Amino acid sequence: MSKAERLLWFVSTIEDTRFLKAFYDSYEGAIDVVHLNLLTRISLIGFEANHYIPLNKYANKTVNPDVSKIFNLLSGRLNQDETLLAYQSVWGLLDSFKTRYNNSVFVIPSGRHVHHVAATDFAKSRKTKRLYINYSNFPGYTFFDPEGTDCLASIYKRPDLLDEMYPEPIDAKRVFSKFYELKKNQSTIPQASSGGLNQILKKLAFSLDTIMQKLIGYVGDRRLTLSAVFAKKNTGDFFEYDEVDLSNRFMFFPMQVSTDQQVLVNYKGGSIEKALEEALSLAQSKNLVLYVREHPAEANRDKVRKKLEEMRQSYTDIRVVSQSVSELIEHSVEIVTINSTVGLECRLAGKPVSFLGDSFYEKASDMQLAKYLDRYLVEVDYHKSIVSDNDINKILKLLR
């Protein structure tokens, strides 16, 4: 490896900090850290690095971007003023470094938070290299890209980059079969919503973090009041699923998390409720019944189920089902999705699929999709972090 570059790594979750530490164990260069909340700072006590918190005192008030489409605001994690202040504080912090990170790489998991957006805009203005990280949703694989995640990724803008990077053709059928089986046999998803006591403890931690943020003058990636921690749920876990015959002709709609970036930002409808209506309209136009499956990581379950129940009461051609995703894909006539991994699974299975949102999975050819899976994704598990020298070399090569 050539001389290792200094990395400025943005972290917002415990998973981020674990992966950072695993990466650091095999990395030859220095890594400094920007914290999007105080919980990550606590988790990295003892980690040898420069640690930064974008305090309000750093805010550059001359920078006034439009924050109306930023995830933290749309998801209700921050209000308008908090979102703008967080952006300005990150910009001001980075500007205070002067030339310290001119030849560094900003490492930005997800890219969705306002702090990530500010870091991205600042890096672009200084021509600083960036590396983004996202879950691949295939166990044992992680996505890295120099321009962004989802529809901001370099390969979304230009799927033909995959042909330039990997000019030799590969056996797409073999790759599709391998990854379809990998997903089909996945028993749990790492980001699945935890319930009961674990969920309360997680919310309690964020509410305490909110108190600390206010005490030191800082806007993190979310603010959560104590009252929200113990807010009473209306419907609990009781919900009646429809009994269905999978031999009937139907269109399958796998729901995404209502606060997902794909729903709030990358889908023009802007809400899961609108997506449900659009999916039903598409099914009706093809004389198909719509089978809907909830997302297991949905945190706003009561709100989503209320909408589902309203639609069941209003229409006779919608069913809410509990069968496995693989069964529903196999037996459906067609699938409609916003931009979920299920859409990719359908491509792998050769099933007709319609995407409501912006999606690389829709734009890529079969060969490009196979190269993405087999060559572009890095075989390292973000949630079970063991990172080798070879993994790091492959990741950093993507900076091209």
Q: Each predicted region: which residue ranges?
A:
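Active-site and donor-binding regions of nucleotide-sugar-utilizing enzymes
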Residues: 10-11, 18-22, 65-165, 343
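Conserved nucleotide-sugar phosphate-binding/catalytic loop shared by glycosyltransferases and other
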Residues: 45-76
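A donor-sugar binding/catalytic signature common to diverse glycosyltransferases
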Residues: 108-111, 115, 322-367
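Leloir-type glycosyltransferase catalytic cores
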Residues: 154-202, 365-400
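Active-site donor-nucleotide binding/catalytic segment of nucleotide-sugar enzymes
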Residues: 244-276, 280, 287, 293-298, ...
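Catalytic donor nucleotide-activated moiety binding site of glycosyltransferases and closely related
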Residues: 277-320
